[in-house]
Amino acid sequence: MKKIISKRNIVFITAATVAGVATSLFTGYTERDNFNMPYSQIPFCAVSPKLPGEITFAGEKILLTAQDRRERLDREILAFTYSHINTLLQLKRANRLFPIVEPILKECGIPDDFKYLMIIESNGDIYAKSTVGACGLWQFMDNTARSYGLEVGKHVDERYHIEKATRAACAYLKESYDEFGDWLTVAATYNAGRAGISKRIEKQKEQKAIDLQLVPETSRYIFRLLAAKTIFSNPVNFGFTIKNRDLYPPLPIAKTLTISTDVPCWADIAKKHGLTFMQLREANPWIRETEMPNKTGKRYEVLIPDSAGLHYNPEETVAHNACWVVK
């Protein structure tokens, strides 16, 4: 016999189902699932982090009481705070990269805070490549890279060479400081170019880029840099609970190999040292192909990781900056 459900019953069933879903969404689970996952009776809550009244960048105190400054910083702080994956990866990668980059900045006379410029340029991704072709941690375009002495080609691309690209970035930043005399303005030139910033300073009769009306990308860039420093100075204040074991340790480099001949197969060199080609390239991201012709006899310094050291105990990882982690 065919059963017919009345409209009244359909309405009742639908209402009960909706009520059940709503209860599930807003009160959380009342029982643990089969995987014994923890549960919460409190729904997700987004909060707006407290902003500082001032920030010191490259030794200069920057007041944030003005409406435009405060609200521009607020936007970037929120972007970092709620872009959980990117910000966590930036912090994890920084533990590996900052010990390499910081001494170079110091040696070249560039303020330590410019390591955060590297972070906002590439998220600390050694293989980063933008849609317009800027590459590496410091996001050099090919012609700019060549003008600062970096080799850019099919087999070798030194925009991905951490030390050399950092030195090239320092050279650019130093030249910009010689012209503008203000480090935050120098940072703006890294995004918009010296000519563009100089023209706007002249037309708007200001002295510093932070007070300029700029295209949205560059305007945000300045405050993204300040936000990066703010977040990295105390991640836990912005909801990032990280332990030592979560950070990426520096690569264990066993030795440096000098090569001035053709390399028919990088994998052969890797295997000779107990490595995979991928592991060799992780330490030398400037290697772009599985082989390297070298007609000029140029000398290349190749970092050889300790194959045993690549297998590590996360619990033994040491934080480069103690303020990044919680006990």
Model-derived features with residue positions:
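An acidic, Gly/Ser/Thr/Pro-rich helix-cap/linker signature
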Residues: 2-109
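Catalytic glycan-binding domains that act on GlcNAc-containing polysaccharides
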Residues: 65-248, 288-293
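Short alpha-helical segments in extracytoplasmic peptidoglycan/chitin-binding modules
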Residues: 190, 266-271, 279-281
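Non-catalytic surface loops within mature trypsin-like serine protease
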Residues: 229, 261, 306-308
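Hydrophobic alpha-helix feature that most strongly marks membrane-spanning transmembrane helices
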Residues: 230, 271-274, 278, 285-288
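Short conserved micro-motifs at the rims of enzyme active sites and ligand-binding pockets
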Residues: 236-237, 269, 313-317
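Primarily a LysM-type cell-wall glycan-binding module
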Residues: 244-274, 298, 326-327
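Extracellular LysM carbohydrate-binding repeats and other cell-envelope/extracellular binding modules
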Residues: 279-325
